[in-house]
Amino acid sequence: MASKITIFFVLALVVVCTMMVCIPTATAELVLPCKTTYDCVNLPCLGRPPLCINGQCKCTTTLTHQAKLDNLRTMNDAKTCKYTSDCDPRMRYSCVSGSYICLNGFCTCT
């Protein structure tokens, strides 16, 4: 009977020690070979455009030239300003780039 209790405690000790050990996890990254950017259209980039860089498909975070121009357009209800400090600091959340300036008397996303 004592041997069964001993085995139970040893087994419980092994289980507790196993649960305390941190097992490192690896983050997986999808690597697709490519020759042109067209080869990367199936890469899941969550709204970011994929590009072929050094023979591998990569998700980019850069804005296109047109997106930057669209972001520069002032809104009809844009606040007037003399200095950038006159603009509402919460405006950065509505700008794609996250930054703004006082341009030609209006608070404008950059």
UniProtKB/Swiss-Prot annotation:
Disulfide bonds join 34-52, 40-57, 45-59, 81-102, 87-107, 95-109. Residues 1-28 form the signal peptide. Keywords: Antimicrobial, Disulfide bond, Fungicide, Plant defense, Secreted, Signal. It is found in: Secreted. The keyword Secreted applies. One of its GO terms (biological process) is defense response to fungus. Its main location: secreted. The keyword Disulfide bond applies. One of its GO terms (cellular component) is extracellular region. Transmembrane segments: none annotated. It comes from the Eukaryota. Belongs to the DEFL family. This is Defensin-like protein 296. It comes from Arabidopsis thaliana (Mouse-ear cress). The lineage of its organism: Eukaryota, Viridiplantae, Streptophyta, Embryophyta, Tracheophyta.
